[in-house]
Amino acid sequence: MILGVGSFAHSIGKALADAGADVSTYLTRNYGHFPPSLAGETFHRDAFPSPVPLIRERKIDVVIPQSIDWALAPWAADLLKSGVGIFSPTGEAMRIERERDFARELCAKFRIPFPKSFVASNRIEAERILAKNPQPFVIKNPLCSPTSPVHTILCETVADTRAWLRHVNYAEGVFLQEYLGRAEAGHIALVSGGEIYSLVTNQEYKYAFNGNQGIVAGAPLGGLVERDENDKYGLARGLLHPLLPWLRKVNYHGPIQVTAIKSNSSVGRASSRAGLEKSNARGGSRGRSPHQKWHVIEYNIRIGVTSGPMILRMLKNPADVILRTTRNEKLKLEFNEELNFGCSLTLAGYGYPFTQVRGPQLPLEVDGKFDCDVWWNEVAQGADGNLVATGHRIADVIALASKLDAAIAMAYANIRKIRVVGSYFRTDVGQSLWPPGTV
């Protein structure tokens, strides 16, 4: 049973159903209800205040949460007591994503590079920190949640930071993380039986528009994955494996993703020279110093809406892998040959990424048949049977292939078959930020 909505529930559910699993979805939000129904039965939270009776009645083996907020639901304790497998770490293990400063402390303990960071409870404290550390900061909420009062604000100069500190919501304080440039990448693994099993190295295109311009959107506009069970780029060795003592101590079993930036830690530090600040604002030069190393930006404990569906398609037995992970058993990962790379593209709707701007429900047209995965998100079916776009994120189009260029080309060929007035997609995924460590 998936706990979620939209393209996450549609994609994860369909990938597992195709692998032979009996899939259902408990709808946890008030939108995106139609797409999961294409993968299996759905249950609305208004009709079923808790999923636990459904889990018992239907003899569910595994639940897969879309968000870490399931742990704050009134039924969370009952879910844990039910004995069902949960494809997520629980308890103390969740803190590595939930609490940003806890992740920083873990990295300090295990000597993992992490940007200089501070927590401030109000504007006065935040401005005092900036005065003592005159450098650009990325502004985040101290607690990670889809409903956080502050979503990531990437400031590339001291002046940017100062301006935003006057404007943000301090309801939960702010987490100020040193800006280290744009050479970002991620690595996703499973932790089970006290071991780390690498899956893919990934890239997310988080900026709203081509050329990595505009604001950091609420969710990525595109993504790439490369099958990487041997940790080709060293992200797991440097940033995940040192955590093994803690992972074992807290009985961590489930997905883990690290997002990191390659930097020598001088990028983004204070300087009186305007030239350095101008270079920082552009994300630094494309050539990377041989002395640069990966720095953790954050950890996530979910398989993710961008990379998750591609990972499940790459695995030969995804349902079995998930089940064994929830049981904390040793894993033997088998991949489908020739599916070495994946590309995900998002079709964004009217007004996105500025979610305050909303349009009407709009007709959705498809010209021809798809030959890759298309996962509907904020889409519904009208009384006439035709599809309509109902929100800001319409679909995720995902293609896999043996070569990266082939996966990208297939994804673009298919996303161009969808038409919704006012919609758009990035046309440059793969042209920057890849290979990992470049901008």
Q: What kind of region is each of these model predictions?
A:
Residues 1-91, 124:
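ATP-binding N-terminal substructure of ATP-dependent carboxylate-amine bond-forming enzymes
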Residues 168-173, 180-227, 236-266, 291-296, ...:
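Phosphate-binding core of ATP-grasp and ATP-grasp-like enzymes
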Residues 273-274, 280, 284-291:
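Short, low-complexity intrinsically disordered segments enriched in A/P/G/S/L with frequent Arg
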Residues 383, 389-439:
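Generic C-terminus detector
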Residues 87-152:
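A conserved helix-loop-beta module that forms one wall/lid of the active-site cleft
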Residues 114-117, 136-164, 181-188, 210-231, ...:
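Glycine-rich phosphate-binding loop of ATP-grasp-fold ATP-dependent ligases
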Residues 236-256, 264, 300-371, 382:
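Active-site "cap" helix and flanking loop/linker of ATP-utilizing ligase/carboxylase catalytic domains
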